[in-house]
């Protein structure tokens, strides 16, 4: 059936409808924990700004969550431009909040913007009580829509201020409607650690338990508690902090020379960054630079030994907290920091502090240096045992493969790059020591239904198999030549198609690689935004709009460039955005043991030749969730 494609066919989503249509773009849909974290972050931001001393969290028996703080209370006056109470605007409008400029909060998670409105959009009901100016206000929402106007429901003392947000998550948006109590507890404890002197309580009405946290010497106490009973080097954590006008960093770290479970946690504006990011990269680089300088100054480095990041990082337990204005995250769930300037800031501060500490604590410093040197020597011995496939040993390596010189699987990376032009730029941009590049011509074969004994008939698949050193459907990874195999395709729809076909190849015929965490997908940016000497990169249209929104308060007109493909980037841009470990974005391709069958069923439906009818039905059902380039 042919439909007319004109202006009437263009749909504009307003209010909170985009969130309800595509919740996965805004939050983690596994459980409603991330919604709770958004509300908790708002209260903790009040504490971070010095306006709150207590945050109470209650998990009710009906799986609803209530967060209460003694901050200033959400504003209830009428917004001058929108003509509605500010609290209503905050709950009902994306990107409405008091944290986009730095007038109200020097540092924040950027919430009361997307965060709290997403909670409203994905909840069956939200009730907000505000204590402010001697009065108690109440407003309520259901399914993202206001069902009760803001009204005064009581009075209170003028100094009795704060906000209470009680929400009931809509189970239809989540894989499991239940909060993970352990994750909630962990987040709350971490918030208490990062806000010394602030009291945080958690009441679990389902399990009838109550917990309270209040740390006076936050990071130090937390790390010491986590490694209690284990031999540590040094005995007391190496702690430090530094605050500038727009950035601040606090850390506590130590090493476990005899092994043990490592505490490795990082935060940005008190938001946990589970996947690390540029701040963690900066910490690692700062420690490495300082240790290298100390070893060279003391002349204790054996000839031929060069320390690398993993030598100093291997047994390091740390808690890192960074506060900064306008943090950039990889995705709305804020699990990985991508602000490039943060790596240099943290690295410089940590290097200076660690060099000073090493020279003031020479005995402990020499033990640390000895541990790092031993690690480097073990790594180098192990690398010598790895026999690389040469022309005289096994199949000849593909001629288009630009190999690396390192042999350590902990460092080596192979990038499968879409297109010869991008492959040429990538070869110039790479670090030749540990990064290998292999360009691919066009779209590879859909191998989902091809048997393992026939799949090597495809030249591209054959070259990939020879380059990585693994045969299709083999569980033997002893001849693996690279620790990371990274798929690097354009950010447009064609590139996504190629990335999908490569993912299918690895899931179907090289599953052992996926199971052991060796396969990654690189996320090149779609946009570059320039304002003066500042450069920003955006992965999606939403990220681009977010950056432009932040740049509105700066002088000058930003210039936006859309990359049509990787080949348009010069080597320096390609290195910064997709190859440099400190600034790139990589997503690991993973399959949980429990999801094996579900993954195979989904891939079969998407890629099998005889499943076109199933694909059509699936598109009719899920098509409104797709992001389509026109």
UniProtKB/Swiss-Prot annotation:
Residues that coordinate or bind ATP: 5, 42, 69, 110-116, 334
Binding site residues for Mg(2+) 1: 418, 490
One MF annotation (Gene Ontology) recorded for this entry: DNA binding
Domain Toprim, chain residue ranges per copy: 412-525
UniProt keyword annotations, A-Z: Antibiotic resistance, ATP-binding, DNA-binding, Isomerase, Magnesium, Metal-binding, Nucleotide-binding, Topoisomerase
Superkingdom, taxonomy of origin: Bacteria
Binding site for Mg(2+) 2: 490, 492
Enzyme Commission designation: 5.6.2.2
Cited HAMAP family: ParE_type1 (MF_00938)
Function, in words: Topoisomerase IV is essential for chromosome segregation; it is the principal protein responsible for decatenating newly replicated chromosomes. It relaxes supercoiled DNA. MukB stimulates the relaxation activity of topoisomerase IV and also has a modest effect on decatenation.
Classification via NCBIfam families: parE_Gneg (TIGR01055)
Subunit record text: Heterotetramer composed of ParC and ParE.
Full protein name: DNA topoisomerase 4 subunit B
């Amino acid at each position: 059936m042919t439909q007319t494609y004109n202006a009437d066919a263009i749909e504009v989503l307003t209010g909170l409808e985009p969130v309800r249509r595509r919740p996965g773009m805004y939050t983690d849909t596994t459980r409603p924990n991330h919604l709770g974290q958004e509300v908790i972050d708002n209260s903790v931001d009040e504490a971070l700004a010095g306006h709150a001393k207590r945050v109470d969290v209650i998990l009710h028996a009906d799986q609803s969550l209530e967060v209460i703080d003694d901050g200033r209370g959400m504003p209830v006056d009428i917004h001058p431009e929108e003509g509605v109470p500010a609290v209503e605007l905050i709950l009902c409008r994306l990107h409405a909040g008091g944290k986009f400029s730095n007038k109200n909060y020097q540092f924040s998670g950027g919430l009361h913007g997307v965060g709290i409105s997403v909670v409203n959009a994905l909840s069956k009901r939200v009730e907000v009580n505000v204590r402010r100016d001697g009065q108690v206000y109440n407003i309520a929402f259901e399914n993202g829509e206001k069902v009760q106007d803001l009204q005064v429901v009581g009075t209170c003392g003028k100094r009795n201020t704060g906000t209470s947000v009680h929400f009931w998550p809509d189970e239809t948006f989540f894989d499991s409607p239940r909060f993970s109590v352990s994750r909630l507890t962990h987040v709350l404890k971490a918030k208490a650690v990062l806000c010394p002197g602030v009291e945080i309580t958690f009441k679990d009405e389902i399990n009838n338990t109550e917990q309270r946290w209040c740390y006076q010497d936050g990071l130090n106490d937390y790390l010491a508690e986590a490694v209690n009973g284990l031999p540590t080097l040094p005995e007391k954590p190496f702690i430090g902090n530094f605050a500038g006008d727009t950035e601040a960093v606090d850390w506590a770290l130590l090493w476990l020379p005899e092994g043990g479970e490592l505490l490795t946690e990082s935060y940005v504006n008190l938001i946990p960054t589970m996947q690390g990011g540029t701040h963690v990269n900066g910490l690692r680089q700062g420690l490495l630079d300082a240790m290298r300088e100390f070893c060279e100054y003391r002349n204790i480095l054996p000839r031929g030994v060069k320390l690398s990041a993993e030598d100093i990082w291997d047994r390091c337990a740390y808690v890192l907290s960074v506060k900064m204005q306008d943090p950039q995250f990889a995705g709305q769930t804020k699990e990985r920091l991508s602000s490039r300037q943060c790596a240099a800031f943290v690295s410089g501060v940590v290097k200076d502090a660690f060099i000073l500490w090493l020279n003031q604590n020479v005995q402990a410093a020499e033990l640390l240096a000895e541990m790092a040197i031993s690690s480097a020597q073990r790594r180098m011995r192990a690398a010598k045992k790895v026999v690389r496939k040469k022309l005289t040993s096994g199949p000849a390596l593909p001629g288009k493969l630009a190999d690396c010189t390192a042999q350590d699987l902990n460092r080596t990376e192979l990038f499968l790059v879409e297109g010869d032009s991008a492959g040429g730029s990538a070869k110039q941009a790479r670090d030749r020591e540990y990064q290998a590049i292999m360009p691919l011509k066009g779209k590879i074969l859909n191998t989902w239904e091809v048997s393992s004994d026939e799949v090597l008939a495809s030249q591209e698949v054959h070259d990939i198999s020879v380059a990585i050193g693994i045969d299709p459907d083999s569980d033997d990874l002893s001849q693996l030549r690279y620790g990371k195999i990274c798929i690097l395709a354009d950010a447009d729809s064609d590139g996504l198609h190629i990335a999908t076909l490569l993912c299918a190849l690895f899931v179907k015929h090289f599953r052992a690689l996926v199971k052991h965490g060796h396969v990654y997908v690189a996320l090149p940016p779609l946009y570059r935004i320039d304002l003066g000497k500042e450069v920003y990169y955006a992965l999606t249209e939403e990220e681009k709009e977010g950056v432009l929104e932040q740049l509105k308060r700066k002088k000058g007109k930003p210039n936006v460039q859309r990359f049509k493909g990787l080949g348009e980037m010069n080597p320096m841009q390609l290195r910064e955005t997709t190859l440099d470990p400190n600034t790139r974005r990589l997503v690991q391709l993973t399959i949980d043991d429990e999801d094996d069958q579900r993954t195979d069923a989904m891939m079969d439906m998407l890629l099998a030749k005889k499943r076109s009818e199933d694909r059509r039905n699936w598109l009719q059902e899920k098509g409104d969730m797709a992001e389509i380039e026109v």
